[in-house]
Amino acid sequence: MNKWLKRLTIGTAAALVLSAPALAEETARPNITAHKANGIVIDGKLDEWNLDSPAVVKDATQVIRDAMLWKGEDDLSATFYMAWDEENLYLAADVHEDTPLGAIEMLPIDGEDNIKLYISTDPSADPARTEYGTNDFLVYFIMDEGYWDTAIDRSMVPKDARQRFVSVGMDGGESVLEGYECAIQKTTTGFTWEAVVPLACFSNNKIEVYTPAVGDTLSCNFAITDIDYPCPGTEYIPQMAWSGTLKINTDPSEWGSVTLAE
C-alpha cells in the first residue's frame, strides 16, 4: 500500500471513529424525567408542577401526518409533562393551537382534536422492541370541552399478548378510563391541560397493576392531533409526535422514554 493510500485509509477510519459518538447522540431516544407528584390539583393550571423536564413538540420534523397542512408552531405545537405517585400517572400539556378544542362526531377518533399517550407499564421491556407487548398501551384523550372522551387502542398488540385486554372506546362517545379526571385553562395561544389517570386503567385480571418506583424507566411517547374546526378541513388532519414517525402506532422502538424520580 503506498503512503498516500495508507494515510487516506487511516484518516477515513479516524473520521468514522470520531463521528460515531455524534451519530449515536443524534439517534438516541429522547428521555424526560417524571417527578413524584406533590400537591397537584387537577384544575388546568400547572402551578404545582415541576416543569424542568418537558417533552417538546414544535418542530417541522415532528409532524408525522399531513405535514403540508401544518402552518407552524402557532397552528399546532405542545409541551408535555408527566408526574406520578404510587397509584396514578399525571399528565400535563401546554398546547399552542389556533383552533383549539375541535371535535366532529362523525370522524374517526384519530381525526378528532386529541392528545395521545403511548405508554409501557413494564420497566423491564426492551426499548428496542419493534412489536407491541402485553404492557404497551395507546391512550386517546379527546380535546372536546364538556365531553373529554377517552379510548385505548390495543389493535396492534398481537392477539396472544393481549391477555384479554382489548381495544375500548375506539368508536368514540365514551370515557373508558375509570377514575380519569382532566381540566383545561384557555390561554391566548391555546390552552393548558392536565389530567390524572389511575394506573389500574392499564390492568385486568391477567395484567397486574404496575407499581411505580424511583429509578424506573418506561417507554413512552406523546402525540397531538389538530383538526381545523369547523368543517371543511377534515380530509387532511395534521398530527405531531414527540419521537418517531407514524410507525409509533405499531413500533415502540420509535418511542422516547420517561424516568421516574422523586
Tell me the role of every PLM-derived stretch.
Residues 1-10:
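Bacterial N-terminal signal peptides that target proteins for export
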Residues 10-11, 168:
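General helical structural elements
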Residues 20-24:
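Sec/Tat signal peptide C-region and signal peptidase I cleavage site
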